[in-house]
Curated annotation (Swiss-Prot):
GO process terms (BP): immune response; negative regulation of B cell proliferation; negative regulation of cytokine production involved in immune response; negative regulation of inflammatory response; negative regulation of interleukin-6 production; negative regulation of membrane protein ectodomain proteolysis; positive regulation of B cell apoptotic process; positive regulation of cytokine production
Source organism per UniProt: Lama glama
UniProt-listed PANTHER family: INTERLEUKIN-10, INTERLEUKIN-19-RELATED
Protein name, as recorded: Interleukin-10
Keyword terms: Cytokine, Disulfide bond, Glycoprotein, Secreted, Signal
Subunit record text: Homodimer. Interacts with IL10RA and IL10RB.
Disulfide-linked positions: C30-C126, C80-C132
Function: Major immune regulatory cytokine that acts on many cells of the immune system where it has profound anti-inflammatory functions, limiting excessive tissue disruption caused by inflammation. Mechanistically, IL10 binds to its heterotetrameric receptor comprising IL10RA and IL10RB leading to JAK1 and STAT2-mediated phosphorylation of STAT3. In turn, STAT3 translocates to the nucleus where it drives expression of anti-inflammatory mediators.
PROSITE patterns: INTERLEUKIN_10 (PS00520)
Family to which this protein belongs: Belongs to the IL-10 family.
Subcellular location: Secreted
Signal peptide: 1-18
Residue positions with a glycan: N134
Length: 178
């Protein structure tokens, strides 16, 4: 066998071994994910606690944005998609507007957003927790109401962020039992 062919084979085998080891690391982090979830949810709740009073004081609306139908979607066959869409909704629509309420609020909302991004990244790496494609009607309803509320929608969505964390917890608890 020529040296160049032998060298190519060795490089290929090294690449396959490295790839397999990386897959094992990813699987290991997924194995530990259920144990780290309570800590991640506590961090989300603590980060939200820094802005909760501000947004709940500004929320003058009596109706709920995050309704029971959203929780039912989280618990049903659309749970994965509902969770994915709601994380995207908060990161792309709610939090950018929520950051416009002063430097202190911006800092805390930004921190909350980073923790939510970390959760989303961990969920995506562990495909059994976020393997989805379908659209959730309940999330579409939340988005529609949020848009109609205009500026008040930010106060409403941020004031109910703790409900969103509870829905995440309900979804993840259900997935870990399966």
């Amino acid at each position: 066998m020529p040296r160049s062919a032998l060298l190519c084979c060795l490089i290929l085998l090294a690449g396959v071994a490295a790839s397999r080891d990386q897959g094992t690391q990813s699987e290991n982090s997924c194995a530990h994910f259920p144990a780290s979830l309570p800590h991640m949810l506590r961090e989300l709740r603590a980060a939200f606690g820094r802005v909760k009073t501000f947004f709940q004081m500004k929320d003058q609306l009596d109706n709920m944005l995050l309704t029971r139908s959203l929780l039912e979607d989280f618990k049903g066959y659309l749970g994965c998609q509902a969770l994915s869409e709601m994380i995207q909704f908060y990161l792309e629509e709610v939090m950018p507007q929520a950051e416009n309420h002063g430097p202190d609020i911006k800092e805390h909302v930004n921190s909350l957003g980073e923790k939510l991004k970390t959760l989303r990244l961990r969920l995506r790496r562990c495909h059994r927790f976020l393997p989805c494609e379908n659209k959730s009607k309940a999330v579409e309803q939340v988005r529609g109401v949020f848009s109609k509320l205009q500026e008040k929608g930010v106060y409403k969505a941020m004031s109910e962020f703790d409900i969103f964390i509870n829905y995440i917890e309900a979804y993840m608890t259900m997935k870990m039992k399966n």
